[in-house]
Design a protein with these regions (language model features):
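Short phosphate-binding loop-to-helix
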Residues: 64-97, 156-157
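Conserved donor-nucleotide/metal-binding helix-loop-beta segment in metal-dependent transferases, i.e.
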Residues: 108-134
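Conserved alpha/beta core of the MobA/IspD/sugar-nucleotide pyrophosphorylase nucleotidyltransferase superfamily
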Residues: 162-212
């Protein structure tokens, strides 16, 4: 098994608008989330390479610390297009699996990644971890990477399964708590602070949102 991770990253100035932060606080938050996610993935023995797809130079500067592949997303026309750019790169490589993560799941651990890949037992398969509210996709393993077209930004992980069902009978939903925790709203922030799973990250979130 040879696996790469794909992380599509929107320009910081256009990200996380629902959080109602200043441009500078949004940038600080995005950097915090991305660095934590990249740090976790880079420590996983199951993932050999990380692919960053973005239009943001600062994203690639952060990615250099983790030896990421850089793919420039000139149009930034959505997550699905970003994934297709990564898929084009993967098609010329020897990776057998890909896993897509968003940048805003900082509470994920390497143990969670191990657990996720324990579900990966079929050659042609799709494994999905939804968000806490079941209104999005927080992890998506595709074996092989081109087995299906992704359907992000449609309001539910179920659309991913509709796409997967056209290509394989092996598709699974994995409920892995820490991967399901993302930062999309103030409610999400309050929820994760109550859990205090990674105290250092929670402290930094409190500082950004001025909750301390």
């Amino acid at each position: 098994m040879k696996t790469c991770a794909i992380i599509p990253v929107k320009q910081f100035s256009k990200a996380k608008t629902r959080l109602d932060l200043s441009i500078e606080d949004t940038r600080v938050l995005c950097k915090l989330l991305l660095e934590e996610v990249l740090g976790t993935i880079s420590k996983s023995s199951l993932i050999e390479k990380i692919i960053l797809v973005s239009k943001e130079d600062e994203v690639f500067q952060i990615g250099k610390k983790f030896d990421c592949i850089e793919i420039f997303d000139e149009t930034e026309s959505g997550v699905n297009n970003a994934i297709s750019l990564a898929d084009s790169w993967i098609s010329n490589s020897n990776f057998t699996h890909s896993v897509i993560f968003p940048q805003d799941i900082p509470f994920m651990t390497t143990q969670d990644i191990d657990m996720l890949f324990n579900f990966c037992i079929f050659k042609n398969s799709v494994i999905l971890v939804p968000s806490r509210h079941f209104d999005g996709t927080n992890a998506l393993i595709r074996t092989p990477s081109d087995i299906m077209e992704t359907r992000y930004d449609e309001g539910s992980y179920k659309f991913q399964f509709e796409s997967a069902m056209l290509k394989t009978s092996h598709y699974s939903l994995a409920l892995i708590h820490r991967i399901m925790l993302d930062i999309d709203s103030r409610d999400d922030v309050n929820f994760v602070l109550q859990k205090n799973i990674k105290p250092t990250i929670c402290q930094k979130l409190e500082e950004i949102f001025q909750l301390s």
